[in-house]
Amino acid sequence: MNPEQFQQALADHGITLSAEQMQQFADYYQLLVETNEHVNLTRITEKNEVYLKHFYDSITGAFAEPRLESEDLTLCDIGAGAGFPSLPLKIAFPQLKVTIVDSLNKRIAFLEDLVAKLGLTGVTLIHDRAETFSAKTSPYREKFDIVTARAVARLSVLSELCLPAAKVGGEFIAYKASAAPEELQQGGTAIKQLGGKVQKTVTLTLPGTDEERNIIVIDKIKATPKKYPRRPGLPSKKPIQ
């Protein structure tokens, strides 16, 4: 997917990118590839692949939750790595107020450079572990309209890291590959215990490929019990069963 195809694929979904926004994506790609030579940010570096599997893939969250396109929502991205999905969403929908949490200082440093280079406002970067970011005494607990994660961790683990940050009435949007139905089945208990309820799963295929993606939207219907999230490392070591 080259930049023009990227722009057209989004236009097909009613999302229009200006020349300025397209330039922001071009600058994002450039800095990502340059920084990746000395900081491990991504194994995907070929231009067309980045536009498809990072930029386009990130924005598909808006296909599942159209409010991202126009409402002044607060969005928290847990473990964003090189900024996915939150920064492509922010470029496409500048009214979003974005908070990014990542546990690696090198990634936060890259994101600081990137946000400055792209001239983005309304972006807060926090160096922290997810478990302490939304712990029971944290000012960020249950504060966000939308919490996103695009990570390889199982849904039962991601839910414990993400649902505590979503406000009651908010949503957790999980970006998953093709194993989503299986993960939903295994993660059902965790989602319920953490105050969530699965609203829907939107399944799509990345254009020009047979790669399946699943966007899982989980409503936060009640407050998360104070004992969650558990201490760092425990959610992945002993997922809620």
Swiss-Prot record:
Catalytic class of the enzyme: transferase
Q: Which residues does the annotation say bind S-adenosyl-L-methionine?
A: 79, 84, 130-131, 150
GO terms under cellular component: cytosol
As recorded in UniProt, its EC number(s) are: 2.1.1.-
Q: What InterPro entries does its record include?
A: rRNA_ssu_MeTfrase_G, SAM-dependent_MTases_sf
Q: Which PANTHER family match?
A: S-ADENOSYL-L-METHIONINE-DEPENDENT METHYLTRANSFERASES SUPERFAMILY PROTEIN (PTHR31760:SF0)
Q: What does this protein do?
A: Specifically methylates the N7 position of a guanine in 16S rRNA.
The record's family statement is: Belongs to the methyltransferase superfamily. RNA methyltransferase RsmG family.
UniProt name for this protein? Ribosomal RNA small subunit methyltransferase G
Q: Which organism is it from?
A: Limosilactobacillus reuteri (strain DSM 20016)
